[in-house]
């Protein structure tokens, strides 16, 4: 491609509304332009990257035995009502009506559509397993679109759905898709981790996220420094402290703590470490037959954070997790929020494993302006349960039993689920088994954020000059930068020759034939992130050489004119 025949819309300045590096560089490199909040037009360079990622995903899906289909973006509301998700989804589900006032949705995902399709096309176990996928635009009306294509309202996604006669078959395909995802992200040159994850609104049982490690990531992941264990912070298990709980030695004492509310304030006032304090949070339980909700006390160590996903999965706790308001706190504990404690609390008490290991600890006295010191489980709190309630912290022992946990930020680029029969049962998708009996199909679903991958790759691969693309997904593999070619016929001829040879070898090459200063050309090629560059000048041609430059390492070397094409083909594996 010649730049004179190409739309190379680079910007010198960073747009003020671009918050993270990938958004800034995608705008500056002329990859995308904003159309509306969370909606972007893809310019040629951006689309070239998007298509390369899409092709890698498609190849790995085909290798895994999945079959490509295409389904409508607009979906009948009745399918969502049938599955039960019409009421589960909030404003992020874009609902619309046609001219006949029939309700539809803009699809954020396609579980309902694919289940409806398969229930009418598949009726025998002989047609299973079946794995169907598509690569298609989705729409979610995000409350706060941000970070460019990282969290847009419109996005390109690969979604696959598998159907099975039994759980064993589902697990087999799930593992095959897990391997396909790893292969795809490895081919893209990404540093990623598959991690255990929560199923969220999609539902089902087993689930893994694929996280690209990046400081700008919205997710926090925990992984062992020794083994392959990795989990989203929501799912990472916090083990109980080793050994027996220390024996009680202090007497229970009530102390005045006026105008002291937070853990840090209590620690400073009483001159104790936050880890020696038990903090108590009150949440609501599930509604009983009369619509009443009990108030439940969750007790954690003062230096630990509540994991709300773990908490709302506890039996009897309202889902979604709902914290008690001031009025409910007053009624249940008889005090303000800053003075709640487990001693004397009349309701159900659930202590985190680490909190349950405390002895002689500080806690609220259930009297505004007072705390207790020397509190102890069993002696002072007779009835309580113990559960894993907290987020893990760096240095915790890994749940796998090997090594300690490290915490890193990640960008979720893929998510796979063992759905089980959540959708197939609700939508009556069944087949006849070998014995002629009707059985509900087991399902899996597998998503990849194709457009998000573009941004995630940039977050991992950039420097002060611009993007540093992995070769497999770069918009161009080689840039030809001729110095003053419009004033030097032999520079122009040599550039034309390299361009023809590289194109004939199947290399994606960008020939910068603009009438621009060399500094502008170099800056644009570095901003765009082309992995390899040939710089041609009269001085080098006098000596029979050109300059080769590697974008990732910054390496420069003079190479004989007769050898440069072979060198590039070798580096690109041609």
Swiss-Prot record:
It comes from the Bacteria. InterPro entries: aa-tRNA-synt_IIb, aa-tRNA-synth_II, aa-tRNA-synth_II/BPL/LPL, Anticodon-bd, Anticodon-bd_dom_sf, Pro-tRNA-ligase_IIa, Pro-tRNA-synth_IIa_bac-type, Pro-tRNA-Synthase_IIa_type1. It is an enzyme of class 6 (ligase). Its EC number is 6.1.1.15. It is found in: Cytoplasm. Pfam families: HGTP_anticodon (PF03129), tRNA-synt_2b (PF00587), tRNA_edit (PF04073). Keywords: Aminoacyl-tRNA synthetase, ATP-binding, Cytoplasm, Ligase, Nucleotide-binding, Protein biosynthesis. GO terms for biological process: prolyl-tRNA aminoacylation. GO terms for molecular function: aminoacyl-tRNA deacylase activity; ATP binding; proline-tRNA ligase activity. It catalyses: tRNA(Pro) + L-proline + ATP = L-prolyl-tRNA(Pro) + AMP + diphosphate. GO terms for cellular component: cytosol. Its main location: cytoplasm. The keyword Membrane does not apply. The keyword Plastid does not apply. Belongs to the class-II aminoacyl-tRNA synthetase family. ProS type 1 subfamily. Consists of three domains: the N-terminal catalytic domain, the editing domain and the C-terminal anticodon-binding domain. Catalyzes the attachment of proline to tRNA(Pro) in a two-step reaction: proline is first activated by ATP to form Pro-AMP and then transferred to the acceptor end of tRNA(Pro). As ProRS can inadvertently accommodate and process non-cognate amino acids such as alanine and cysteine, to avoid such errors it has two additional distinct editing activities against alanine. One activity is designated as 'pretransfer' editing and involves the tRNA(Pro)-independent hydrolysis of activated Ala-AMP. Homodimer. HAMAP family: Pro_tRNA_synth_type1. This is Proline--tRNA ligase. It comes from Aeromonas hydrophila subsp. hydrophila (strain ATCC 7966 / DSM 30187 / BCRC 13018 / CCUG 14551 / JCM 1027 / KCTC 2358 / NCIMB 9240 / NCTC 8049).
């Amino acid at each position: 491609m010649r730049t004179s025949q190409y739309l190379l819309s680079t910007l010198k300045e960073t747009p003020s509304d671009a918050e993270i590096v990938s958004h800034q560089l995608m705008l500056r490199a002329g990859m995308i332009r904003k159309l509306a909040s969370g909606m972007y037009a893809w310019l040629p360079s951006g689309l070239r990257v998007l298509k390369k990622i899409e092709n890698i995903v498609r190849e790995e899906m085909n290798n895994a035995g999945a079959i490509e289909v295409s389904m409508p973006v607009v979906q009948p509301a009745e399918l969502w009502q049938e599955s039960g998700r019409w009421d589960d989804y909030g404003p992020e589900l874009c609902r619309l009506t046609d001219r006949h006032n029939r309700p539809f949705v803009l699809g954020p995902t396609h579980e309902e559509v694919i289940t409806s399709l398969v229930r009418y096309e598949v009726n025998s176990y002989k047609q299973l397993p079946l794995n169907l996928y598509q690569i298609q635009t989705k729409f979610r009306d995000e409350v706060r679109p941000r970070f460019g294509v990282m969290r847009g309202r419109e996005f390109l996604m690969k979604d696959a759905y598998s159907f099975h006669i039994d759980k064993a078959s589902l697990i087999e395909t799930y593992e095959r898709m897990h391997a396909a995802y790893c292969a795809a992200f490895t081919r893209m040159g990404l540093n990623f981790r598959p991690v255990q994850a929560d199923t969220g609104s999609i539902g089902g049982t087993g689930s893994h996220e694929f996280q690209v490690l990046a400081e700008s990531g919205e997710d926090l992941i925990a992984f062992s420094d020794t083994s392959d264990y990795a989990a989203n912070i929501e799912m990472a298990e916090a083990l109980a402290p080793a050994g027996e709980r220390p024996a009680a030695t202090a007497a229970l004492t009530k102390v005045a703590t006026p105008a002291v509310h937070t853990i840090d304030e209590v620690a400073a006032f009483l001159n104790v470490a936050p880890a020696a304090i038990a903090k108590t949070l009150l949440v609501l339980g599930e509604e009983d037959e009369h619509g009443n909700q009990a108030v439940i006390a969750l007790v954690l160590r003062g230096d630990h954070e509540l994991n709300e996903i773990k908490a709302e999965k506890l039996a009897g706790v309202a889902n979604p997790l709902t914290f008690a308001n001031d009025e409910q706190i007053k009624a249940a504990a008889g005090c303000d929020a800053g003075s709640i404690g487990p001693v004397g609390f009349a309701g159900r008490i659930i202590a985190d494993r680490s909190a349950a290991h405390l002895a002689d600890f500080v806690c609220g006295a259930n009297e505004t302006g007072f705390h207790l010191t020397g509190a102890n489980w069993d002696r002072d709190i007779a009835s309580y349960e113990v559960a894993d309630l907290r987020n893990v912290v760096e240095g915790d022992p890994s749940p796998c039993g090997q090594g300690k946990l490290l915490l890193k930020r990640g960008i979720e680029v893929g998510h796979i689920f063992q759905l089980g029969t959540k959708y197939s049962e609700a939508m009556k998708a069944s087949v006849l088994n070998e014995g002629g009996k009707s059985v509900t199909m087991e399902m899996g679903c597998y998503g990849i954020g194709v457009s998000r991958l573009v941004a995630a790759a940039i977050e991992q691969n950039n420097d002060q000059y611009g993007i540093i693309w992995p070769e497999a997904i770069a918009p161009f593999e080689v840039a030809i930068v001729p110095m003053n070619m419009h004033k030097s016929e032999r520079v122009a001829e040599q550039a034309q020759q390299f361009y023809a040879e590289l194109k004939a070898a199947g290399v994606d090459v960008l020939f910068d034939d603009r009438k621009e200063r060399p500094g502008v050309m170099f800056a644009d090629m570095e901003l765009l992130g082309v992995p390899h560059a040939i710089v041609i000048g009269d001085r080098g041609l006098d000596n029979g050489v050109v300059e080769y430059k590697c974008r990732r390492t910054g390496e420069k070397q003079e190479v004989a004119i007769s050898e440069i094409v072979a060198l590039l083909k070798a580096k690109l594996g041609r």
